[in-house]
Swiss-Prot record:
Residues 30-59 are annotated as: NMP. This is Adenylate kinase. It is found in: Cytoplasm. Its main location: cytoplasm. GO terms for cellular component: cytoplasm. Keywords: ATP-binding, Cytoplasm, Kinase, Metal-binding, Nucleotide biosynthesis, Nucleotide-binding, Transferase, Zinc. Zn(2+) binds at residues 130, 133, 150, 153. It comes from the Bacteria. Pathway: Purine metabolism; AMP biosynthesis via salvage pathway; AMP from ADP: step 1/1. It comes from Desulforamulus reducens (strain ATCC BAA-1160 / DSM 100696 / MI-1). AMP binds at residues 31, 36, 57-59, 85-88, 92, 160, 171. Consists of three domains, a large central CORE domain and two small peripheral domains, NMPbind and LID, which undergo movements during catalysis. The LID domain closes over the site of phosphoryl transfer upon ATP binding. Assembling and dissambling the active center during each catalytic cycle provides an effective means to prevent ATP hydrolysis. Some bacteria have evolved a zinc-coordinating structure that stabilizes the LID domain. The keyword Transcription regulation does not apply.
Length: 213
């Protein structure tokens, strides 16, 4: 089974990807991991990507697509894969379609994890980090035993600047703006599966498995 997973920051996409690949016995292709591996192995596409990254420039689509094509051609993808973190735009999705066609691969479903905006805000702004040892807490899901204090070292907990409401709001709006056309693109192809991410992890997983089987 060949799948693609999407979801805004805070939707639990990473958690679902981890359990899903084990459940379906397919390969997890995270674009971040793929980049690191290609650069480390010194592949042709990895070298090209490194040139751009060293200059602090965005890696062009054709290089990313080249890396995705290399990765999908590897033996561990023959039994199926879960693509995570790519595509991010309709242009990339269209290029991915052409690549899959070249490789004779069919994309079976696109999983889109949906969580209401206010819930995402609560999830993302609730993180607290210990100034002393770096331990991470969450005011709702993993609160410290004593408010504002680390369980391990009694250090002071603080909210990172990129976890405040303004920063989180900007990130979420950017995601929505950028991916709305992508969601429409896959919906038009009839392979989009919208999943309610505002429930227990096991319930979300169950809904995904029902949707893709």
């Amino acid at each position: 089974m060949n799948l693609l997973i999407m979801g805004p920051p805070g939707a639990g996409k990473g958690t679902q990807a981890e359990v899903l690949v084990k459940e379906l016995k397919i390969t997890h292709i995270s674009t971040g991991d793929m980049f690191r591996a290609a650069i480390k192995e010194g592949t042709e596409m990895g070298k090209k990507a490194k040139e751009y990254m060293d200059k602090g420039a965005l890696v062009p689509d054709e290089v990313v697509i080249g890396m995705v094509k290399d990765r999908l051609s590897q033996a561990d993808c023959k039994e199926g894969f879960l693509l995570d973190g790519f595509p991010r735009t309709v242009e990339q999705a269209s290029a991915l379609d052409a690549t899959l066609q070249d490789l004779g691969i069919k994309l079976d479903a696109v999983i889109n994890i949906e969580v209401p905006l206010e819930k995402l805000m609560a999830r993302l702004t609730g993180r607290r980090v210990c100034k002393n040892c770096g331990a991470s807490y969450h005011v709702i899901f993993n609160p410290p035993q004593a408010e504002g204090k680390c369980n391990s070292c009694n250090g002071e907990l603080y909210q990172r600047s990129d976890d405040n409401e303004e920063s989180v709001g900007t990130r979420l709006n950017a995601y929505i703006e950028k991916t709305k056309p992508l969601i429409d693109y896959y919906e038009a192809k009839g392979i989009l599966k919208n999943i309610n991410g505002d429930q227990e992890i096991s319930a979300v997983l169950n809904d995904i498995l029902v949707a893709v089987k």
